A protein has these predicted regions:
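Hydrolase catalytic cores
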Residues: 1, 124-172
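Catalytic-core segments of hydrolase enzymes
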Residues: 1-133
Length: 172
């Protein structure tokens, strides 16, 4: 789950706050639409090391204005889109521990990745992934990147392979 570009202005949206109902509904409809049209990869949650099973304090709300952040109780809050509905597959990033043999090592949760036994569905490699670099880093055009944005394409690829073998399967 990656909050690099979470749905402003809150990292966690509260279903009980009337002012946030329209935003939650819009996100929910967009995800339903995407689900009905096939596999979609959204890397939009953040590398906040949050426990999605037990959200407590939202330190980045609202995050649009520097210095305007306020802490608020977000128990029962929703991190959009990862926690929005059952059609969303929430991905956590994992990595090989430093200095271990890839053939025998056990993967560990990447230190930046969000987590939760009931709110994260799958884990995929997300640390030190060889990838194309952003356009502003043109020399060289490839390098190592880390983040759940690196893990979610792995999960989407597996979902696409499963869909190829089982075309009758749905996102549910």
């Amino acid at each position: 789950s990656n909050s690099s570009y979470y749905m402003d202005p809150y990292a966690f949206w509260m279903p009980t706050e009337g002012s946030q109902a329209a935003g939650l509904e819009a996100a929910s409809r967009a995800i339903r639409y995407a689900k009905n049209h096939g596999v979609v990869n959204i890397a939009a949650e953040g590398n906040d090391n949050d426990d999605h099973d037990n959200p407590t304090i939202d330190k980045a709300s609202p995050n649009d204005v520097e210095g305007a952040a306020v802490e608020r109780n977000v128990a029962g809050g929703v991190d959009v889109p990862a926690m929005l509905n059952d059609s969303v597959v929430s991905v956590s990033a994992v990595a090989l521990p430093t200095g271990t043999d890839p053939a025998t090592a056990k993967l560990e949760r990447s230190k930046f990745s969000n987590y939760g036994k009931t709110s994260v569905d799958v884990a995929a490699p997300g640390s030190r992934i060889w990838s194309t670099l952003p356009t502003w880093k043109k020399d060289p055009p490839f390098g190592y990147l880390s983040g759940t944005s690196m893990a979610s394409p792995h999960a989407a690829g597996v979902a696409a392979l499963i869909k190829e073998i089982h075309p009758d399967y749905t996102a549910d």
